[in-house]
């Protein structure tokens, strides 16, 4: 959420940010409601002052034996007007709050301006794609052939875009989770196993609601929703708290199932493990002082890239443009892994600096030494998406006979060098 005072004093900056991010919000209505609300509050304050003044006169006039009926009538009229204004103020505040929730975060000054993914900028590339001496198979064909992926039975049990992961591939999936968590805890992240049923306030706090509500699975008749990412519970773990400056930065690594309806994703990478309604992900979240958030973002990026390098998976880093960076992001890098069957790079991690956008919505502050509470900055990054990493390992480490060579860094977890039927 943006600071209303900033919106009030910098409407042109906010208007340009809306254009750059491709978001449509009635900014003029926000400004008009803000003016009306402040006028109402000023009038109420004046009326209350007048009522206090008049109420004192009543006692004095009564002692003097004078008629106070006119003054009492005035007090009644003042009370009626205050009630009328209070009712209107609640209406104005509710509408204003709803509109403020629709305002995206402002992009950082060094974020490229662009309408969509065509405006993203590649800033780094690591590793050379493997040259195969045999026809490359997509991971879904490899998995089905070794009886490690079963989409048909998953469709029978649940529906489309779900999967059973079995046998050696299930062990490889579990190995990836353990490797990711071990890698990050060794670098100062505290492991957290978060709840995957989240209330509405938490989704508003992290910024997914109201904009992305249609992409979330909700439990009918309740205030609960399934978690779309561990970012939501990890950020809201400190909602409505004032943190001691000495504990910053806070670093958490959370592992959870992720549930997404992906309402707008029809036809986009919907085969295999790339875009499923349920998947598992390891997530990095940090709470920092504002002046340290840029450094924290690069640390998160380095962690995501470091894990891919240990897996020896070629990747590239993309700086996302304004039109493709997301609603709440101040700055965002996507890490994309090479997928041989696609003959292109596919997103495997998004690393974002949210500045104070989530902290304002969730009311997360810290107290500097000797100062007033200030909003923290929050950051998050996939570390990594497990199903997509499994797919990347399968494709990049496939053998002509359909088996999968296990990356060396995972062998202590799998206790084998090859996955086969």
UniProtKB/Swiss-Prot annotation:
Annotated InterPro entries: aa-tRNA-synt_IIb, aa-tRNA-synth_II, aa-tRNA-synth_II/BPL/LPL, Ser-tRNA-ligase_type_1, Ser-tRNA-synth_1_N, SerRS_1_N_sf, SerRS_core, tRNA-bd_arm
Reaction catalysed by this enzyme: tRNA(Ser) + L-serine + ATP = L-seryl-tRNA(Ser) + AMP + diphosphate + H(+); tRNA(Sec) + L-serine + ATP = L-seryl-tRNA(Sec) + AMP + diphosphate + H(+)
Pfam short name (any one): tRNA-synt_2b
GO BP terms, alphabetized: selenocysteine biosynthetic process; seryl-tRNA aminoacylation
Localization per record: Cytoplasm
CDD domains in the cross-refs: SerRS_core (cd00770)
Major localisation: cytoplasm
Enzyme class: ligase
Chain sites annotated for binding L-serine: 229-231, 283, 382
Key words, A-Z: Aminoacyl-tRNA synthetase, ATP-binding, Cytoplasm, Ligase, Nucleotide-binding, Protein biosynthesis
Pathway participation: Aminoacyl-tRNA biosynthesis; selenocysteinyl-tRNA(Sec) biosynthesis; L-seryl-tRNA(Sec) from L-serine and tRNA(Sec): step 1/1
Any one GO CC term of the record: cytoplasm
Keyword Membrane set for record: no
Keyword DNA-binding recorded: no
Binding site for ATP: 260-262, 347-350
Self-association and partners: Homodimer. The tRNA molecule binds across the dimer.
The protein's role, per its UniProt record: Catalyzes the attachment of serine to tRNA(Ser). Is also able to aminoacylate tRNA(Sec) with serine, to form the misacylated tRNA L-seryl-tRNA(Sec), which will be further converted into selenocysteinyl-tRNA(Sec).
Domain notes: Consists of two distinct domains, a catalytic core and a N-terminal extension that is involved in tRNA binding.
Family the UniProt entry places it in: Belongs to the class-II aminoacyl-tRNA synthetase family. Type-1 seryl-tRNA synthetase subfamily.
Name recorded for this polypeptide: Serine--tRNA ligase
Species annotation: Symbiobacterium thermophilum (strain DSM 24528 / JCM 14929 / IAM 14863 / T)
């Amino acid at each position: 959420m943006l600071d209303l005072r900033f919106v009030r004093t910098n409407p042109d900056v906010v208007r340009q940010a809306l254009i750059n991010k491709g978001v449509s919000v009635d900014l003029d209505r926000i400004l008009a409601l803000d003016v009306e609300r402040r006028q109402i509050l000023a009038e109420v304050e004046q009326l209350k002052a007048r009522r206090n003044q008049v109420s004192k006169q009543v006692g004095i006039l009564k002692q003097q034996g004078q008629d106070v009926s006119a003054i009492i009538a005035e007090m009644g009229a003042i009370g009626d007007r205050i009630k009328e204004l209070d009712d209107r103020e609640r209406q104005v505040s509710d509408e204003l709050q709803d509109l403020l929730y629709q305002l995206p975060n402002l992009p950082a000054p060094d974020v490229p301006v662009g309408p969509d993914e065509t405006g993203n900028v590649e800033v780094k590339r690591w590793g050379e794609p493997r040259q195969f001496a045999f026809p490359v198979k997509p991971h879904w064909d490899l998995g089905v052939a070794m009886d490690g992926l079963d989409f048909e039975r998953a469709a029978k049990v649940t529906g489309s875009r779900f999967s059973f992961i079995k046998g050696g591939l299930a062990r490889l999936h579990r190995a990836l989770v353990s490797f990711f968590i071990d890698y990050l805890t060794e670098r100062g992240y505290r492991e957290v196993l978060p709840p995957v049923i989240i209330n509405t306030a938490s989704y508003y706090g992290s910024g997914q609601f109201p904009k992305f509500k249609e992409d979330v699975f909700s439990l009918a008749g309740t205030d609960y929703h399934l978690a779309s990412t561990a970012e939501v519970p990890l950020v809201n773990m400190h909602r409505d708290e004032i943190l001691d400056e000495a504990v910053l930065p806070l670093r958490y690594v959370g592992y959870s199932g992720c549930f997404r309806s992906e309402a707008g994703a029809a036809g986009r990478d919907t085969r295999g493990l790339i875009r499923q309604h349920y998947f598992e992900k390891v997530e990095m979240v940090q709470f920092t002082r504002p002046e340290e958030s840029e450094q924290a973002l690069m640390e998160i990026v380095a962690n995501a890239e470091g894990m891919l390098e240990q897996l020896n998976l070629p990747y590239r880093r993309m700086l996302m443009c304004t039109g493709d960076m997301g609603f709440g992001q101040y700055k965002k890098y996507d890490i994309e892994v090479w997928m041989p069957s696609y003959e292109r790079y596919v997103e495997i991690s998004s690393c974002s600096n949210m500045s104070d956008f989530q902290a304002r919505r969730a009311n997360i502050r810290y107290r500097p030494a000797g100062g007033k509470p200030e909003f923290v900055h929050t950051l998050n990054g996939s570390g990594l998406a497990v199903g997509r990493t499994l797919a990347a390992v399968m494709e990049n480490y496939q053998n002509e006979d359909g088996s999968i060579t296990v990356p060396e860094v995972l062998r202590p977890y799998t206790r084998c060098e090859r996955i086969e039927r």
